[in-house]
Amino acid sequence: PLSAADKTIIKHLTGSVRTNAEAWGAESLARLFATSPSTKTYFSKFNDFTANGKRLHGGKVLNAVADVTDHLDNLAVLHGTTLLVDPHNFPLLSQSLLVTLAAHLLALDKFLDEVAKALSSHYR
């Protein structure tokens, strides 16, 4: 689990994520769609796969990931009952995000792993 220190670091890093959300989000989505093309079906409301479309939607996705830093203690309930995030595809997205962000934000590996665990725990 995330320690109090981890949570503090994660919340601090959110500013960097938000500042670069469109660029990093677009790169992450492009990587996700290239490595796991079937994940496009989970983006049914998103049909603009142009560079600009990915940039804008990638920004929304990455900002949504940043938003969960305010809910680190109840991720499973939030995502399982309110946001309805598919727990099976989040690890694929988190891997794409990690590859994109690893050079800049190393602490996110642990954070994204905890998000994936929290999402999965709600469905057991």
Swiss-Prot record:
InterPro entries: Globin, Globin-like_sf, Globin/Proto, Hemoglobin_oxygen_transport. One of its GO terms (cellular component) is blood microparticle. Residues 1-124 form the Globin domain. It comes from the Eukaryota. Red blood cells (at protein level). Heme b binds at H79. One of its GO terms (molecular function) is organic acid binding. It holds the Pfam family Globin. GO terms for biological process: hydrogen peroxide catabolic process. Keywords: Heme, Iron, Metal-binding, Oxygen transport, Transport. O2 binds at H57. PROSITE patterns: GLOBIN. Hb 1 is a heterotetramer of two alpha and two beta-1 chains. Hb 2 is a heterotetramer of two alpha and two beta-2 chains. Hb 3 is a heterotetramer of two alpha and two beta-3 chains. This fish has three hemoglobins: Hb 1, Hb 2 and Hb 3. They all have a similar Bohr effect. Belongs to the globin family. Involved in oxygen transport from gills to the various peripheral tissues. This is Hemoglobin subunit alpha. It comes from Somniosus microcephalus (Greenland sleeper shark).
